[in-house]
């Protein structure tokens, strides 16, 4: 009985870890889009959460 319980918990943890690992690349891609979305804006313009446009890139966004 304990073996089945441990096996079930292990499988659930594995599924949760895989789901979390799959979500991270999307988060990074979204963060990159935020950082690079300064096309047409002049340098010094605010962008993202706390970023500033420099040479067409949003520097410091999300930090």
Curated annotation (Swiss-Prot):
Residues 1-21 form the signal peptide. Residues 22-34 form a propeptide. Expressed by the venom duct. It comes from the Eukaryota. Its main location: secreted. Contains 2 disulfide bond. This is Conotoxin Cl14.11. It comes from Californiconus californicus.
